[in-house]
Swiss-Prot record:
InterPro entries registered for this protein in UniProt: Metallo-B-lactamas (IPR001279), PQQ_synth_PqqB (IPR011842), RibonucZ/Hydroxyglut_hydro (IPR036866)
Pathway membership: Cofactor biosynthesis; pyrroloquinoline quinone biosynthesis
Keyword terms, alphabetized: PQQ biosynthesis, Transport
Keyword Transport: yes
SUPFAM superfamilies: Metallo-hydrolase/oxidoreductase
A single BP term in Gene Ontology: pyrroloquinoline quinone biosynthetic process
Function of the protein: May be involved in the transport of PQQ or its precursor to the periplasm.
HAMAP family: PQQ_syn_PqqB (MF_00653)
Descriptive protein name: Coenzyme PQQ synthesis protein B
């Protein structure tokens, strides 16, 4: 299995365009050791030629321009994106669909709950019908494996996770199980597995078996502490309000990852306020000591027979 991180930041990217928090200003003036990041999305493949896009960030055009694997040479117009899977209906995971309109029709897999949000509150499915048929919806059901024709050796399973519906959704603060899913992806040729969850609130007993059998975790690293936005003076929401489990809290993401056997544990969807963006921060060093990696834009991951 081949995985490439197109974008590793949370909504707004890093630096965020209107933010002068310590991280954003530090990156701009060169006083911290950090790198710019676009908003969260990845591609996966069973052969390194045809790819499935998992979430379409607002930065998708820039991300594709920096990903030669997706350029389909020899045709006037084309792409090696053979399908799109959405894990939720959040703005930072779906706005990029609008930028892909010239390539419609696109085959899009998502739950009925996500499709409802994207047909009403943020109606991209409706808007894009005028572009060569727009987005073709393939419903996915929780814990029911499915495949995408472009990558037939990859089996995807949507796993419901505790998070939140987007602010525009009528289900905000009362999400249904299909509003947020992780993806458990298995290469049926060699059995290697990836668990992808860019947004994860509170893990429960039903989620743990999926986490425990994954060879590689690509998982929510949004905030270091639950009140991070408040402490930085840039917002009122807590990590929990937004549907994200804080890394450094007593029973947070680091503690969860320490209990799991995955060969690699990699963080994605990192907010601009998170101190782990600074490679020299104590928080980043704490991750390194526990063998937890921080993804970056363009990071390539290969899952082979014996290791990932």
């Amino acid at each position: 299995m081949f995985i490439k991180v197109l974008g590793s930041a949370a909504g707004g990217g890093f630096p965020q365009w209107n933010c002068n928090c310590a991280n954003c200003q530090g990156l701009r003036d060169g006083t911290i050791q950090a790198a710019p990041r676009t908003q969260s999305s990845i591609i996966v493949s069973d052969n390194g030629k045809e790819w499935v896009l998992c979430n379409a960030s607002p930065d998708i055009s820039q991300q594709i321009a920096h990903t030669p694997e997706l350029n389909k040479a020899g045709v006037l117009r084309g792409t090696h994106i053979g399908g799109i899977i959405l894990t939720d209906s959040q703005i930072d995971h779906t706005t990029g669909l609008l930028s892909l309109r010239e390539g419609c029709p696109h085959q899009v897999w998502c739950t009925p709950e996500v499709h409802e949000d994207l047909s009403t509150g943020f109606p991209v499915f409706t808007m894009l019908r005028h572009w060569n048929g727009g987005l073709v919806h393939h419903p996915i059901a929780p814990q029911q494996p499915f495949t995408v024709d472009a990558c037939p050796d990859l089996q995807f399973t949507a796993v419901p996770i505790a998070s939140n519906a987007p602010p525009y959704s009528p289900y905000r603060d009362r999400p249904l199980p299909g509003h947020n899913v992780a993806l458990f992806i298995e290469n049926r040729r060699n059995g290697q597995t990836l668990f992808y969850a860019p947004g994860l609130g509170e893990p429960d007993e039903t989620l743990l078996p999926w986490l425990q059998k994954a060879d590689c975790l690509l998982i929510d690293g949004t905030v270091w502490q639950d009140d991070e936005l408040q402490a930085a003076g840039v917002g009122r929401n807590t990590g929990r309000d937004m549907g994200h489990l804080a890394l450094g809290d007593e029973h947070g993401m680091m503690a969860l990852l320490a209990s799991l056997p995955a060969k690699r544990k990699i963080l994605i969807h990192i907010n601009n306020t998170n101190p782990i963006l600074n490679k020299q921060s104590p928080q980043r060093q704490a991750l390194t000591q526990q063998g937890i990696e921080v993804s970056w834009d363009g990071m390539a991951i290969t899952l082979q027979d014996t290791a990932c």
